[in-house]
Amino acid sequence: MAGDLPSNGLISRNEPIAIVGAGPAGLACAILLARAGRKVVVREWHKTVGSRFHGDYQGLENWSGKRDVLDELNEAGIQTSFSAHPVFQGTAYDYRGKDYPIIGDRPLYYLVQRGGQKDSLEQGLLDQAVSVGVDIRFGERATSIEGPAVSAIGPRSADAIAAGYIFETDQADSNHIVFDNKLAPHGYAYLLVHNGRGTLASCMFSGFKNQAVHVARSVKFFEEKTGLKMNSPRAFGGFGNFRIPNTAMQGGHPLIGEQAGFQDMLAGFGMRYALRSGILAAQSLIDGTDYTRLWRAQLLPLLKIGISNRFLYNAAGDRGARLALRNISHSNASARLHRLYQPSLLTKIIFPLARRQFRRPLHDPSCDHIACQCVWCEHGVGHAD
């Protein structure tokens, strides 16, 4: 039973390990467990990977760590079996529409495509998992977990949403972001174009009820600033969940990715944290290292800094964002962004206040019952959509 598995206990090499959820975190964990000779079964209730996404472009951030994110993944045993286009520069805009060139001396992020199509992040990880012998079971709904397992079912509430369009275009490759509360309350709107395909979205941290208005304003803004013409636009949307878990364990099983709340609260980037949490969970199951200790050492400092940065960003408003853009545009953006995600006296002082202000978004809905076997807590049984 689930309660019989200690959180830091070694698992028999012959005992199958179940992973619930075939997102990036779950697949990364499965790949590393299989490479270590473990039998792995991934249970995914959708019929394919990437069902939450629609072929939209996203950024795999490359600023929170000292090392390049792809090097970090490769060293851990995750090959770059998906398309990852390095982005060194782009254009940012403030609330007045003034543009600022943003340039880094190393990739600011890697542009990846989300969904189940060829070359997407999810499909690349799936192909890699299958190649190392992972048993993938689609259309299999998990309502409880018994035996050694990892839970990776994704976000369970919407603390931020992104809504917009994916489309075809003749526009040249480009990357744009605008910080304007009229377009994206407490967030940002973005336009990413690569190889004749584009993604335009408003990423909102509040004002969800008026998302259609914010998206329409974002479209108009980028049409006026870049001459954008969208061909065959298709609407899409997504959401993210932020929190700091108590242990990121449930019933003796590691929780990884967005199910654990591992996402940057400032910018909403979560892929790097998700992949890293999958790597840490695999390590804990392979060598018996305590998973809670691992993620607290590698992810907790970043989560705390993200919360403090979010508090400061909200307090600064549009004018503060304008000043920040001015400073970043006159420096190496890679170094500036990396510095933003390092501990400082200010973020340490701000954190207790910020955590109190964001108490509800940071609430941990996981069950605290040691022997809990349910996949979805707060509190019910069933696999989340």
What is each model feature region?
Residues M1-I17, R35-A36, T143, G198, ...:
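Extreme N-terminal leader/targeting segments of oxidoreductases
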Residues P86, Q211-W295:
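FAD/FMN-dependent oxidoreductases across multiple families
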Residues P245, A267, Q283-L323:
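Active-site-proximal substrate-binding core of FAD-dependent oxidoreductases
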Residues G26-L27:
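N-terminal Rossmann-fold NAD(P) dinucleotide-binding loop
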Residues A316-D385:
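C-terminal auxiliary extensions adjacent to catalytic cores
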Residues A22, H46, G116-R234, G240-T247, ...:
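Predominantly flavin-linked oxidoreductase catalytic cores and closely associated redox partners
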Residues G50-D94, A163:
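N-terminal FAD cofactor-binding segment of flavoenzymes
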Residues A22, A34-D56:
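Glycine-rich FAD pyrophosphate-binding loop
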